[in-house]
C-alpha cells in the first residue's frame, strides 16, 4: 500500500493539463451531467501538490504544458498571470470543453510546440509567453461560458427545491416541526 507521499507530486512550475477522451460515464474533475465532456483542463501553480488516488488513472490521450515562472521574466504575462484565477481552483473545478473549444486549445498548444522547435533567439520567450497568454485567454472565455451554463442549471435546481418546499408547507407536514428529508427534496 503506497504512502501518500508516493502518490503526490509537487510541481515547481505552472502546468496546464488537457485530458481528452474521458469515458462517457467519467465524472472526473467535478464534471456534471450538463457540462461538456469532450475534454477537461486542469491548471496547477508552482509549489502546488498534485495527488493521484488509486481510483484515478492517467488519461489515454492529452497534453501537458509546463513552464517555469522564469520563462515569464520580462514579458507582459509575468505582470498579470495572477489574473488567471483558475490556476488556484480546486481540481473539482476543472474546465470542461466542447469539441470546438478543444480544437482551439489544441491549436494553441500546437503553436506553442512549433515555437519550441524554432531555434532560440531574443524573441523566443516573448513569443512563447504570448502564445501561452492567448491559450489562457481562451481558457478564461471557456470558464466564463461554463459558469453561465452552471448558473442556469443551479438556478433551475433552486427553483425546483423552492417549489417542493412550498408544497411541503402547503401539505401541513411542517406544522409538526418536521423538516423535509433530503430524499423528499431530491
Regions found by a protein language model. Name each.
Residues 66-70, 113, 136, 181-186:
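Juxtamembrane/interfacial segments around transmembrane helices
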Residues 151-186:
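A short, Lys/Arg-enriched amphipathic alpha-helix from helix-turn-helix/homeodomain DNA-binding modules
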Residues 10-13, 129-136, 158, 162:
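Generic structural concept
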Residues 86-134, 138-143:
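Amphipathic alpha-helical segments enriched in hydrophobic/aromatic residues interleaved with Lys/Arg
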Residues 70, 138, 142, 164:
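Phosphate/oxyanion-binding loops and surfaces in catalytic or ligand/nucleic-acid-binding neighborhoods
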Residues 2-90, 99, 121:
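N-terminal regulatory/effector-sensing and dimerization cores
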Residues 141-152:
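C-terminal regulatory or interaction extensions
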Amino acid at each position: 500500500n503506497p504512502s501518500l507521499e508516493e502518490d503526490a507530486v509537487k510541481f515547481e512550475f505552472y502546468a496546464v493539463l488537457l485530458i481528452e477522451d474521458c469515458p462517457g460515464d467519467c465524472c472526473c474533475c467535478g464534471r456534471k451531467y450538463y457540462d461538456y465532456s469532450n475534454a477537461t483542463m486542469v491548471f496547477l501553480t508552482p509549489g502546488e501538490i498534485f495527488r493521484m488516488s488509486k481510483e484515478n488513472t492517467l488519461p489515454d490521450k492529452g497534453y501537458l504544458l509546463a513552464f517555469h515562472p522564469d520563462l515569464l521574466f520580462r514579458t507582459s504575462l509575468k505582470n498579470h498571470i495572477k489574473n488567471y484565477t483558475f490556476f488556484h481552483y480546486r481540481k473539482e473545478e476543472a474546465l470542461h470543453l466542447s469539441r470546438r473549444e478543444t480544437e482551439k486549445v489544441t491549436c494553441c498548444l500546437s503553436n506553442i510546440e512549433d515555437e519550441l522547435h524554432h531555434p532560440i533567439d531574443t524573441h523566443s520567450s516573448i513569443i512563447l509567453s504570448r502564445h501561452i497568454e492567448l491559450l489562457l485567454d481562451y481558457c478564461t472565455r471557456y470558464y466564463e461560458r461554463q459558469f453561465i451554463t452552471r448558473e442556469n442549471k443551479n438556478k433551475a435546481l433552486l427553483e425546483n427545491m423552492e417549489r417542493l418546499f412550498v408544497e411541503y408547507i402547503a401539505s401541513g407536514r411542517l406544522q409538526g416541526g418536521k423538516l423535509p428529508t433530503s430524499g423528499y427534496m431530491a
